[in-house]
Amino acid sequence: MPTESASCSTARQTKQKRKSHSLSIRRTNSSEQERTGLPRDMLEGQDSKLPSSVRSTLLELFGQIEREFENLYIENLELRREIDTLNERLAAEGQAIDGAELSKGQLKTKASHSTSQLSQKLKTTYKASTSKIVSSFKTTTSRAACQLVKEYIGHRDGIWDVSVAKTQPVVLGTASADHTALLWSIETGKCLVKYAGHVGSVNSIKFHPSEQLALTASGDQTAHIWRYAVQLPTPQPVADTSQISGEDEVECSDKDEPDLDGDVSSDCPTIRVPLTSLKSHQGVVIAADWLVGGKQAVTASWDRTANLYDVETSELVHSLTGHDQELTHCCTHPTQRLVVTSSRDTTFRLWDFRDPSIHSVNVFQGHTDTVTSAVFTVGDNVVSGSDDRTVKVWDLKNMRSPIATIRTDSAINRINVCVGQKIIALPHDNRQVRLFDMSGVRLARLPRSSRQGHRRMVCCSAWSEDHPVCNLFTCGFDRQAIGWNINIPALLQEK
């Protein structure tokens, strides 16, 4: 997750490395070294005691092996592009190709033509590892129920959080490592307001339940409350992003992220001073949220505490201690005075403020790695996501074990639940977004290829189930937020 301003570039470089397709082949000669007792540098050095003919043969064999690796790698990339193209053509029919199986089959065929016994063994090993490069395209008919509608591009760095306003006019909010928060028109994708009051990464954004107020948390160790006033522009026809010309496909496939030569946020009004600044933490404030009613706010920090503030006076009401490591997220119940905090200590805690005289805490243990988020649903359930690649559904009345567990192939970031339909949106480190129901049944995976979808890790998801244009939003470290239209009735019918 984000650090303070000095470490934002470091986080970005770290995430960029995840997408590197460079292939580094380390030539080892352990068997030769064991037989001859000579180190590798002597085999390659000028003073090697090996005959020149033997050295030349060795170097030639190494060159052949390297070329075979390179050919396999190129073929794998070509197969991946073919799979993307075929899936887009078949998306309208609700079909998908199992890319993992296709890639393995193709690679097996191509590997069988090897004439060298040694290179054949190495190629088989390489094939097993590189088959993971191709995305897994599991057969599902739900692709037709999920459509990319709008891309919101304007941030200069990764976007950590996305949120939808609860009051009219309904706008989209994004929080970024570029030290700003932006408000967007959902229909047009135009930036309406820029908040530039923080001096560190903006790690979360949440809207007040009844007023035009936003709450942002930052790496500068503060949380800000600021007022906005927006006027929505006239909606323009939404472009169909599912149909892209072949010329555009080649152009887009070479891009790792959106082209941001022009700063679209430079033309929108900028707010630089908050109404209220909440200052009590001694570390990065990673998340913040409004308690029911909007008169109090809670913050979560890397100093291992969560703080409860009075919004009107900015006074600290409670400091919530108990986590053993940095906090990663906090969330409030929509109708009750309950707070849930997540931590790197593999637990999340439920704090109960319904009794003004005393607050109680319950600890949930069940994950084996950082709990990246835990959120409330309607009723007595909490859903938690973790870097251990699982999502767990819990009953607040029974903390001992989850009532459902979802196992995935990638770490999970800030999840969100569609309250009305009880659908969980899972944003992954591996650029995928998957939808599950509360019992753990997978409903869909959002379309993603070299031409659409996220190009780096997806950090957060947010539902807006009543919006006519987009009812799901995601954001990621590719510096863009995306609005999706999820046909929920069709999704549930296919279930």
UniProtKB/Swiss-Prot annotation:
UniProt repeat feature WD, residue ranges: 154-194, 197-236, 280-319, 322-361, 366-404, 407-446, 453-494
Disulfide cross-links: none
Pfam families named in the record: WD40 (PF00400)
Residue ranges, compositional bias (Acidic residues): 246-264
Ranges of Polar residues composition bias in the record: 1-13, 22-31
InterPro entries: G-protein_beta_WD-40_rep, WD40/YVTN_repeat-like_dom_sf, WD40_repeat_CS, WD40_repeat_dom_sf, WD40_rpt
Subunit structure: Forms homodimers. Interacts with PACS1. Interacts with PACS2.
Protein name (record): WD repeat-containing protein 37
